[in-house]
């Protein structure tokens, strides 16, 4: 099920029009199209819902543990005002993480990529969707649980 704020989704991406200034990004022609792309991509995670919070669109949902089936992680993906030029912020709202957890930034934000990686394997405004970030968060959770069990963070650092 796709969510479109208003109008219909164009078949091709219109030119970016964020410079219009006052309107939230999702109310511009490009933004409506991009929100359709984002919503369609998030259909891969049916437990996530899009809501409006504090002037931003936010996806909220749970990811389940792969190593401990009863463990659940409440995750939010918040679009910034200048999306897609700025990356959405991912936060693992619960559970709380112990101090010293590797690859965890302030406010329970997992380090999913290094900005210096750019389009190679980091955030790319043209290709990265909220769905991409949720999938990367699931990988981060798996690495976190592996680190808890073994004391070693698997794979390379973000």
Give the residues covered by each predicted segment.
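Hydrophobic/aromatic beta-strand elements that line small-molecule binding cavities or substrate pockets
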Residues: 75-77
